Amino acid sequence: MGGISIWQLLIIAVIIVLLFGTKKLRGVGSDLGSAVKGFKKAISEDEPAKEAKKDADFVPQNLEKKEAETVEKQKQNDKEQA
């Protein structure tokens, strides 16, 4: 009906095993698995660096707000004293 049936996939798998052999297929599978594992590890190591950058962005803004509040308080105190 236009789609690939399970029997066709099974026949293709048998032909691939006969052509390449099980040792080469195991080697390719393990290489592919280690590549995926390395990719996932690299992605997970990259995410904390992005979070650290976000945290670093918030710290200076808070300091600027505190400094601005301190300056405003000093101005109010100066006005009250004068």
Curated annotation (Swiss-Prot):
One of its GO terms (cellular component) is TAT protein transport complex. It is found in: Cell inner membrane. The chain crosses the membrane at residues 1-21. The keyword Transport applies. It is a single-pass membrane protein. Residues 48-82 are annotated as: Disordered. Part of the twin-arginine translocation (Tat) system that transports large folded proteins containing a characteristic twin-arginine motif in their signal peptide across membranes. TatA could form the protein-conducting channel of the Tat system. NCBIfam families: PRK02958.1, PRK04598.1, tatAE. This is Sec-independent protein translocase protein TatA. It comes from Aliivibrio fischeri (strain ATCC 700601 / ES114) (Vibrio fischeri). The gene is tatA.
